[in-house]
């Protein structure tokens, strides 16, 4: 207790003691084994190189058979030589024009035997172009190409026409019927035409022909919706104009105006015919 010394700690309470086991300076990432394995692999590889085991494997790609470009070149030269012997100046041929890649008929203007090229003049165009002799085609190739192009164009046109017919069939059908149905109310709503013979109207005698003007033709069908229905019989009072809301546009206003003109002309003609009928009836009565 005395002497200022502390009490000794019991053994069970010690958690860490420096200097026992691993120290703070020890390297826990020791790669000695990895270095030894690497050195062993390198040594075995060097040993195999000395014995010649790997040299044979490395020499195998060198012993593979070489390609034969020379033979191919020989065959190409042979074909080119044959083409040079086949074509001559003035011959008809077919050539691919470099601008569009299409085949056109041409005539050989000159041949360079060293370069294995030639100059062709396209028939009907006059364009001159240098071509390889091996690329020249027979005139029949141009005809076959034209036939193929015509066939392709016909197929495209037929496809377009088929698409158009399908689109028309998919569109709202029976448009003429719809137009007729819209125009039908004119026939039922029109006032009856003036009588062509004596019908008891006015003092005219029976059988007196009516020489008044015929009624005007009905307006276009798109204005039929503006004509209100009224019962058949002699017109007494013109039908009232449709009630136009404030939101009508120019087309609606134009339709209302045309309807008014039509009805005004019709009733004016009817009135003039009626008066003419009365006048002729009076003249025949006095005679």
From Swiss-Prot:
Residue ranges constituting the Tudor domain according to the UniProt record: 86-146
Ranges of compositional bias, category Basic residues: 63-77
Cellular localization per UniProt: Nucleus, Gem; Nucleus, Cajal body; Cytoplasm; Cytoplasmic granule
Residue segments, region Disordered: 1-27, 52-83, 148-216
Cysteines joined through disulfide linkages: none
Subunit structure: Homooligomer; may form higher order homooligomers in the dimer to octamer range. Part of the core SMN complex that contains SMN1, GEMIN2/SIP1, DDX20/GEMIN3, GEMIN4, GEMIN5, GEMIN6, GEMIN7, GEMIN8 and STRAP/UNRIP. Part of the SMN-Sm complex that contains SMN1, GEMIN2/SIP1, DDX20/GEMIN3, GEMIN4, GEMIN5, GEMIN6, GEMIN7, GEMIN8, STRAP/UNRIP and the Sm proteins SNRPB, SNRPD1, SNRPD2, SNRPD3, SNRPE, SNRPF and SNRPG. Component of an import snRNP complex composed of KPNB1, RNUT1, SMN1 and ZNF259.
Modified residues (Phosphothreonine): 20, 64
Written domain comment of the UniProt record: The Tudor domain mediates association with dimethylarginines, which are common in snRNP proteins.
Required for interaction with SYNCRIP, as annotated region: 273-287
Positions where Phosphoserine occurs in the chain: 23, 26
MF terms (GO), sorted A to Z: RNA binding
Role noted for this protein: The SMN complex catalyzes the assembly of small nuclear ribonucleoproteins (snRNPs), the building blocks of the spliceosome, and thereby plays an important role in the splicing of cellular pre-mRNAs. Most spliceosomal snRNPs contain a common set of Sm proteins SNRPB, SNRPD1, SNRPD2, SNRPD3, SNRPE, SNRPF and SNRPG that assemble in a heptameric protein ring on the Sm site of the small nuclear RNA to form the core snRNP (Sm core).
UniProt-recorded name of the protein: Survival motor neuron protein
UniProt organism field: Canis lupus familiaris (Dog)
Region (P2 (binding site for SM B)): 234-261
GO cellular component terms, semicolon-separated: axon; Cajal body; cytoplasm; cytoplasmic ribonucleoprotein granule; cytosol; Gemini of Cajal bodies; neuron projection; nucleoplasm
Keyword Ubl conjugation on entry: yes
Gene3D superfamilies per UniProt: 2.30.30.140, Periplasmic binding protein-like II
Keywords: Cell projection, Cytoplasm, Isopeptide bond, mRNA processing, mRNA splicing, Neurogenesis, Nucleus, Phosphoprotein, RNA-binding, Ubl conjugation
GO BP terms: DNA-templated transcription termination; nervous system development; spliceosomal snRNP assembly
Family per record: Belongs to the SMN family.
Chain segments carrying region Required for interaction with RPP20/POP7: 92-205
Comp. bias (Polar residues): 157-180
